[in-house]
C-alpha cells in the first residue's frame, strides 16, 4: 500500500469557532464570509494569477478536529435523521480513512499585500483554523450535472426553524451592526439550519444551547415556535 504526504498551503479564517453549528454543506448560510490565507512559500501573487476570473472554488482541506477518531465503515447521515446507517463512502462524513474534505465556496475577492495572499470567501462551511491542502477553480460545464442522482441528498436541505430574538438582544445587535455587518442575519441563518443532533430535535421547550460565532457566545432556547436568542456574550 502506498503512502503519501501533503503540505498545508493555507488556513481558513472563519466566524465558526467550533464544530457545533457549522453548516453541514457549503452555501447554506449565504451571509457567512471568511478568508483563506495562503502560507509560505505559496503566498505569492503569481500563484493566484487569473483566479479572480472564477466565481467559485473547490477548497480541499483536512478534517483536523475529528481525524484522531479514525474512520468508520458505516455512519449515520444527519439527512436520514441520524438513525439509518450508510457506508462512509456514500456520505460526506468526517470519519474517513483519509480525513480529506472538499467545499465549494464563492470567491468574493483576492487581496495581495506584501507577503500576504488572502482569498475572500462566501458561503463557508469550515471551522476557523481548518488546514487547506489545495484549491481548484470550479468549472460549471464539467461539474454542474442537473441530471445526476444523489440518493437521500437529492434536494437541498431547507431552513427548518424559525429564529427570533429577545428585545434586548435585538437592540444589542443594532448597536453592533457597524462593526459586524449583517450579524443578525448571520446568526439567524446559522440557527435556522438547526445545528442540534438529529436525536435531540424533538426536545421540549426551554432547553438551551450556546455556540461561539465570531467574537460572541450566542445562547438560545427552544420555544414552541422555534429558537429564541436570549444572550450574546463577548469573549
How would you label these PLM feature ranges?
Residues 1-45, 51-53, 140-190:
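Arg/Lys-rich, positively charged N-terminal/basic patches that mediate binding to nucleic acids
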Residues 2-8, 95-105, 214:
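Short coil-to-beta-strand transition motifs
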Residues 17, 109-116, 225:
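Short, conserved beta-turn/loop elements at beta-strand boundaries and strand-helix junctions
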Residues 47-101, 193, 199-205:
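Active-site-adjacent substructure of cysteine-protease-like catalytic cores
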Residues 114-124, 229-230:
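Short, solvent-exposed secondary-structure boundary/capping segments
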Residues 119-153:
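Flexible glycine-rich active-site/ligand-binding loops centered on an Asp-His dyad
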Residues 217, 222-235:
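Enriched for short, Lys/Arg-rich terminal
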